[in-house]
Amino acid sequence: MKYIALPNDKLLPELRKYDADGHVVLLSDKVYRLSFYLAMEEYVARHVNEEDCFFMWQVNPSVIFGRNQLIENEVNIDYCRENGISMFRRKSGGGCVYADMNNVMFSYITKEVNVGFTFNRYINMVAAVLRKLGVEAIPSGRNDIMIEGRKVSGNAFYLAQGKSIVHGTMLYDTDMRNMVGAITPSSEKLLSKGVESVRQHIALLKDYIDISIDEFLVFVMNHLCDGCIRLTDKDVKEIEEIEREYLTDEFVFGNNPRYMLVRKSRIDGVGDMEIRIEAKNNIIKKVNMLGDYFIVGDIDTGLLKRLIGVALKKENLEKALPDDLSEYVLNLKKEDFINILLG
């Protein structure tokens, strides 16, 4: 697997520095907006012809929420604005996370497009690296890595340019006050995981290893990658062009019209799902899906458009929808989806 480095990436071997005791000390490089790194993933998917690519990044305080999430439900917007925390939407599904310079974000781009295989391979690969550091890290659920029952890494997935992109957090350390203040997880989600506080729910890697965050970055790079591809200034300019989409208010805040009916539920193995329906005479006129589920197909064509003009009755919905909804949303069963629609 190749490591994708920016022109002056602090992880490049020739740019690394060491202290008197031989410990690596990485020089500060340019910190881009979180949206830049999302655009970089797309750029690598489009232009780097390698089987597997990987890179790591750190950002100033930011929250990043999933493609299908309603920002007002997930983010404490006032807190973020008052505390200088930037807000970004990504193109993958999954939930809302907080990131800052004390934790690390991972990006993995592969030609393998089978979602189950890709997730399994990537998460096991990262967990194996943590175990080499003496940490009892194990994959858990659909997208997490756990230490002693607490999450140290959460990951999300989407398809782009015929490749799979997996990205996620690695909690070396973090500002707990900002993490709690910036994100507003649903009480239902917390209850389902049996936790009473965010701190009980997460593990910080610094509590389990005795190396600095700089040493951790180098360790991961050395153990996951067998070579490096260095991007050019021209590549950076093209990435910044892709980034423009991520910065528009339309993309970040979305077009969220008012709907007459709101259906909410949490499905084991799928996640939180909120369906907003505008109906007239019990006929669906508009429908939108929100939540932290994972998209694996075209839900607009495969699911939502099929519902327009359909009566909100079980037999009508069964006829309108395809039998295998897991082709569009990971692990989603037709019966569960119809039950949510009917409230």
Report the location of each language-model feature.
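Active-site cofactor/substrate anionic-group-binding motifs, chiefly glycine-
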Residues: 72-96
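Residues forming anionic-ligand binding surfaces in small-molecule and nucleic-acid pockets
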Residues: 91-110, 188-206
